[in-house]
Structure formats: structure tokens, C-alpha cells
Amino acid sequence: MNKKFEKLGFYPADILLPKDQDMRKWAVVACDQFTSEPEYWQAVEQTVGDAPSTLRLILPEANLKAPNVDEYIADINASMDKYLADGVFQVLPESLVYIERQQSDGRIRHGLIGMVDLDAYDFTPGSGALIRATEGTVLDRIPPRARVRRNAPIELPHVMLLIDDPEKTVIEPLTAVSYTHLTLP
């Protein structure tokens, strides 16, 4: 890991981006969304069809208690291996990626994609760890998540970190620079 970032617990990483994919089928919401609406995920399945998609790389929490959850997990790991072997990804080595997301109200959220040092993370309420949870952690969701990661050749985190930056020295300077970007339809 890059020593310059040690005190942050947040580092540049080898970031995988899909290349030559239909982004309407590739991108899906975080796995912890629509947990009580399996019909939402069935509709996503219909939309994606056989196309490469992050749907094949995540375990929607709506399926955590499915009787065939172990089969889902094996399929996720197989999809990861296949996508890597088939060259589905473009690799951005040792990178941070600046992102902008437009919310439904029109506001733009700005952020960085990178790697979090999980040794610096603690989800215990009241923790003083460098990186800590801002909302409650549902403990019974951890074991299936750990099973997905056990044999996973890639990581697909879905967390958003909030930073304590009252001087606005991290994200705000990036918003002033012009970038080439991909706009999703």
C-alpha cells in the first residue's frame, strides 16, 4: 500500500472498470437496497438477461436467506473468474477515481473510489477507530458476505465513506477540474 495514505486508511487501488459494456445492464444498485422486494431484483434480472453485469458479481440481500444461497455464492465467484478471464475489465492501476452522481433532486454528489484498510475499520457503536460506521450494522448479514468474499478474486464494495474535512481540501478542489467522463443513460 502507498505509504503516503497510511494515516488515512484510504488508498489508491487497482480499479476495475467495465470496457465495452452496455452500462444500462452493467450497473445495478447496491446489494443492500430493496431487501424486502425480491420482485425488484427479478425485474433487474429480466433487464440484464445474459449480458455481463454487476448483478452477477453481488449477492442482493433480498437473497440472503434463499435456500440456494450457497449456489448463488458459487455463481458469483464463477462470474468473477469468467469476467477476469474474458477481459471484461479495464484495469486502472494504483488509482483513485473521481465520481459525480446526480441525485433525483438534481444535486450532484462528488466522491472518490479507492481502497479502505479494513484493519482501520470498526462498526461498533461509539468506536474511535479511524474508519467507523455511521449507521447500524446488521450482524446476521456478515456471514454470507464473508462467504462471498472467501473465494472472490475481486472486491465489489458498496460503501460510501464520509470524511471529516472542514477545510474542504479533498473533494472540493477536484470539482474545479474538467474531466472526461462517462454519462449513463
Question: For each predicted feature, which ranges?
Answer:
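N-terminal extension/subdomain marker
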Residues: M1-V177
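Conserved small/polar residues in nucleotide/adenosyl-binding loops
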Residues: T180-L184
